[in-house]
A protein has these predicted regions:
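C-terminal hydrophobic helical "lid"/dimerization subdomain
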Residues: 82, 126-177
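Short strand-turn motif at the edge of the Rossmann-like AdoMet-binding core
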Residues: 97-101, 121-124, 147, 151
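Mid-domain Rossmann-like dinucleotide-binding core that forms the NAD(H)/NADP(H) cofactor-binding site
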Residues: 1-53
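Short glycine/proline- and charge-enriched loop/turn segments
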Residues: 14, 112-115, 140-141
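Aromatic/hydrophobic pocket-lining residues that form π-stacking "cages" and hydrophobic walls in ligand
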Residues: 12, 16, 36, 59, ...
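Glycine-rich cofactor phosphate-binding loops and adjacent beta1-alpha1 units
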Residues: 3, 38, 43-119, 157
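Anion (oxyanion) recognition and catalysis
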Residues: 21, 112, 137
Length: 177
């Protein structure tokens, strides 16, 4: 089976944890939030690390002396983006799922020598949306348990405050009541 490192354990990261587990991958997740690391484990990550604690030696240690087959970047954090290039095995792949900064430094010789493929994701096609709905209906992706808080419209300010603090919440929903 493949090993996938997911950098960032927000909603996108948790979705990728579940997708990766669905195809039998070993999943290593990172984040700077202890709460989000706990969520990553809850959603199926085999290993969760504070972003500052994961390095290529640690990946090799828990992965039979190999780096990751795939790295999925679900954060805009510059150091995570830079680290992604060091976490991937020869002929592996990196997916930038989060929007990177306008200019990122890419170690082209390193990528060339290791024959690493880089992919970017932007938006979703109608077919992607249909597939996502199907996966949710089949209970292969659990979006409902990503909703950690719900606020009535009258408390929308409280909801936005919770989101902006980005502490112990994942997805916050505002209802029309």
């Amino acid at each position: 089976s493949e090993t996938v490192v997911i950098l960032g354990s927000g909603i996108s990261g948790l979705t990728h944890v579940q997708l990766s587990k669905n195809i039998g991958s070993k999943v290593i997740s990172t984040d700077v939030s202890k709460y989000r690391l706990e969520q990553a484990k809850k959603f199926g990550a085999d290993h969760s690390y504070h972003a500052g604690d994961l390095n290529s030696d640690e990946i090799r240690k828990i992965n039979n002396n190999r780096l990751a087959d795939k790295v999925i970047v679900c954060t805009v954090n510059d150091s995570a983006i830079k680290s992604s290039f060091n976490y991937v095995e020869k002929r592996g792949a990196i997916l930038f799922f989060a929007v990177p900064a306008e200019n990122i430094s890419i170690p082209s010789n390193h990528l060339w020598r290791k024959e690493i493929s880089i992919f970017f994701s932007y938006g979703a096609t109608p077919d992607d949306i249909k597939e996502t709905i199907k996966l949710a209906e089949e209970k292969k992706i659990d979006f409902n348990n990503m909703i950690t808080h719900s606020f009535p419209l009258s408390k929308i300010i409280e909801g936005f405050k919770l989101v902006s603090e980005a502490k112990e919440s994942m997805k916050v929903v505002v209802t029309g009541t």
